[in-house]
């Protein structure tokens, strides 16, 4: 869907790769998935170079050209100050306010995925907490645990502003009606993800923030907790991860921040 099916070797330039990376980020692809895509392209371009299909000057990878990000190279998480800027952002349009609030709800609701967000129902709320199981893991063989999220005042305000009337079987937000096929549900989820990302991209540009997407909300939730001193085990459970390694990958940018801060301490003499 990025540039069609027929792509020539000559069209794969540094700029093309950067545009493709941005496209994948907007599609909510993880850093590891993006790395897989680009290593595959690089392998194809390496073979094309060996076969004489492209010249060395046309090869888009390497120092001074496009470099594939390592797993911890991209800073995905925002700071609390940036989140505050987003929460206060207002361009006067209802659409921006709605999608901004949806993004904030994703962040506040343990970095919930859009696929799980659209399926939340009022019956999932018990004693001031939302209970849900991640769609990504609900069909695995491992025993499933509910993710529980305290409903904070900002979350409640978002529900009151944009939610459906409160009935036990009703979806909290007016995205699904419960009559969709699995494919229709997938398409509605994808449409909502793109709509949120489009608005958040505009907000990011206006606020001078590098990149904001639904995926950023999840990374930010994890990193803010880590910065506050929460244990990796707690963060892993809050995210619904099956193992700590996955959580550690999420927190890679935080570890980089810590190394930079500690390195700076060493120079204070």
Put a short name on every predicted segment.
Residues 10-11, 55-56, 68-88, 141-152, ...:
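DNA breakage-rejoining catalytic core of tyrosine-based enzymes
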Residues 35, 56-114, 118:
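Basic, Lys/Arg- and aromatic-enriched nucleic-acid-binding interface segment
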Residues 11, 63-64, 119-161:
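Conserved tyrosine-mediated DNA breakage-rejoining catalytic core shared by Y-recombinases
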Residues 124-129, 209-211, 230-249:
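Short, polar N-cap/turn motifs at the start of nucleic acid-interacting alpha helices
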